[in-house]
Amino acid sequence: MLSLSLKKLCKMIYLRPFELLEVNRLISWVNSPELLVQFSGPGFNFPLTKVAWDKHLSDTSIHPYFVVDLNTDETIGYSEIVKVDENEVKLCRLLIGDPDLRGLGLGKLLVRELIYESLAIASPKRILLNVYNHNTAAIKCYQSEGFVINESVSKTSLVDGMEWKSFQMDLML
């Protein structure tokens, strides 16, 4: 019999189009100002609201998804693909909602699913994403899926009086 932790590692996921009527689930996961910035960048105010998220999703280049556990059909995360143009897409706002499910390899599965879905949305030659330099777990996850740090594209945000540096990571196809 598999141990509980090994069973968690064996979980498979799929992407389901996000529906605004379920936004409260997303809002409940983003439960601190720091997590909001890490998840969405500096463009939102805490607490996240349905109105702000609805406005955000009015951009038709954004393809939002819930991340769903294939075994239980439980919604466990959120992510977006932004079509920059036909040759480039950006992965944004990757989040496994339940902290107990983080660090179990689901992020790698999510990145793979997003790469496959990106190919259905466009014909990208490059997939990019942004990550804060202190988010080492995410950086390792993205590197394991072939993304390379591009420090020439970086930004700094002020979060609670501290500077957070982010940089771009690229996957060339």
Question: What are these regions, as identified by a protein language model?
Answer:
Residues 120-130:
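Conserved GNAT acetyl-CoA-binding A-motif
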Residues 9, 13, 17-23, 28-100, ...:
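Acetyl-CoA-dependent GNAT
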Residues 97-100, 104, 133-134:
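Active-site acidic-Proline motif in GNAT/NAT acetyltransferases
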Residues 128-139, 156-161:
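Conserved beta-strand-loop-alpha-helix junction that forms the acyl-donor binding cleft
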Residues 105-111:
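Glycine-rich acyl-CoA binding loop
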Residues 2-5, 162-173:
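Terminal substrate-recognition subdomain of acyl/acetyltransferases
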